[in-house]
């Protein structure tokens, strides 16, 4: 039986589990890889730290804003539900279409790839074997999620707490036990670092922060959602920003920017310099990264499958994707669909391609969702709002400005990939109209 918001699955996800979704999605794998990527692009400590601070501020502005939408419209699908309410079915369908074709599959593939790469520390794997191992990890996570949200959420809470503590400890030990140097922080900001380069480096940074809106995709399963969702979204963004700054400053104290840039498995490189861990440092960190990536993979599967479920439940996707397992109360078809897409992507793309596709696909819709706060305040003033955006209208305006600048920068610096991603989004329009005509004929 559906509840007052039209949701059919049990509301059993707690506040702490909702925060774990946000933190679990963000701290999946990128933080163990992206610091080296950013250092290779920016080369200097000032721009590197500024990039991580700016990414955290942008993510926090987004979380502060969409928390209002999540509390007012606690429905499965998150951004999909907000776009449907703010702009109607076409923009909502285009988000779901892009989530289906690009966003979720790329996210699952990127996280699973890092899991498999770090497994290679213990078991030598060829490039092809890394891809097959990543595909198997996605299938295993799909099976766990099929068995029910409580099993998946319990696993997520435990692994998220573990990886957060390990990551914070690694950052702090990098300051105190690596024999690093404060000289790595100077010169802080050399002349000749263009702002466009900083904007380009923001793309992988924002991928590591992504997760601040994901708990809302499960709004239909969150208990007491009008009280739970807003604090969970904000707390998740703050927790991630704090630990990322500790880790990056710690890494830079242990390694000069040039050394960071040359270390693909940077967390293991730093751990090798911590005498407290002995010779086991890299192995300990490699295991922690695998746990972290597995946790992030679980969180991404939990949230992404709910978008497909919500689309189908509202008549904008194949009806079969709205089926709920009578035994496990999970959106079974949507979960296996996400699993199949993730496997297909991981077998055809490398990590950098996957991360870039995810960011370029999601950010136009983040901007639309945040703009929906302005739209709904004007069009639906009577809508109950248990939480209102702190710093309105400045906070959502800052996020919108950052989103527009980032998409424009991507168009100028990487026109091919950006153009392809935007074409994929637009290509959903004729698909929407064909489906709408088919529905009318029925």
What are these regions (language model features)?
Residues 1-36, 40-46, 59-60, 64, ...:
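Membrane-interface "cap" regions at the ends of multi-pass membrane proteins
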């Amino acid at each position: 039986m559906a509840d007052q918001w039209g949701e059919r699955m049990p509301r059993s996800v707690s506040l702490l589990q909702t925060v774990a979704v946000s933190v679990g999605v963000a701290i999946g794998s990128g933080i163990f890889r992206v610091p080296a990527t950013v250092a290779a692009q920016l080369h200097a400590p000032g721009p590197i730290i500024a990039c991580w601070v700016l990414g955290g501020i942008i993510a926090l502005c987004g979380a502060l804003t969409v928390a209002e939408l999540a509390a007012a419209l606690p429905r499965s699908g998150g951004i999909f539900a907000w776009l449907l309410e703010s702009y109607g079915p076409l923009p909502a369908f285009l988000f779901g279409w892009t989530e289906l074709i690009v966003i979720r599959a790329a996210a699952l593939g990127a996280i699973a790839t890092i899991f498999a790469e770090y497994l290679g520390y213990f078991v030598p794997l060829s490039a092809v074997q890394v891809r097959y191992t990543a595909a198997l990890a996605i299938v295993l996570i799909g099976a766990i999620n099929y068995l029910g949200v409580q099993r998946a959420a319990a696993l997520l809470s435990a692994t998220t707490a573990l990886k957060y503590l390990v990551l914070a400890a690694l950052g702090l030990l990098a300051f105190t036990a690596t024999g690093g140097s404060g000289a790595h922080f100077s010169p802080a900001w050399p002349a000749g670092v263009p702002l466009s380069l900083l904007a380009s480096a923001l793309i992988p940074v924002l991928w590591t922060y992504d997760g601040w809106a994901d708990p809302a995709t499960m709004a239909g399963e969150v208990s007491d959602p009008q009280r739970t969702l807003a604090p969970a979204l904000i707390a998740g963004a703050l927790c991630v920003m704090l630990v990322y700054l500790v880790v990056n400053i710690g890494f830079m104290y242990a390694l000069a920017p040039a050394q960071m840039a040359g270390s693909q498995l940077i967390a293991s490189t730093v751990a090798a310099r911590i005498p407290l861990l002995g010779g086991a440092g890299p192995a300990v960190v490699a295991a922690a990264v695998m746990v972290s990536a597995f946790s992030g993979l679980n969180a991404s599967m939990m949230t992404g499958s709910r978008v497909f479920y919500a689309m189908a439940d509202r008549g904008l996707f194949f009806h079969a994707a709205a089926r709920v397992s009578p035994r496990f109360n999970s959106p079974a078809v949507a979960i296996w669909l996400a699993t199949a897409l993730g496997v297909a992507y991981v077998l055809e793309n490398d990590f950098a391609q996957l991360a870039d596709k995810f960011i370029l696909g999601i950010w136009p819709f983040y901007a639309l969702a945040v703009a929906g706060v302005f739209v709904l305040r004007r069009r639906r003033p009577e809508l109950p709002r248990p939480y209102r955006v702190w710093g309105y209208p400045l906070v959502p305006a800052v996020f919108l400005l950052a989103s527009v600048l980032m998409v424009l920068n991507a168009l100028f610096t990487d026109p091919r990939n950006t153009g392809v991603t935007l074409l994929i989004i637009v290509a959903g329009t004729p698909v929407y109209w064909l489906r709408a005509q088919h529905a009318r004929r029925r």
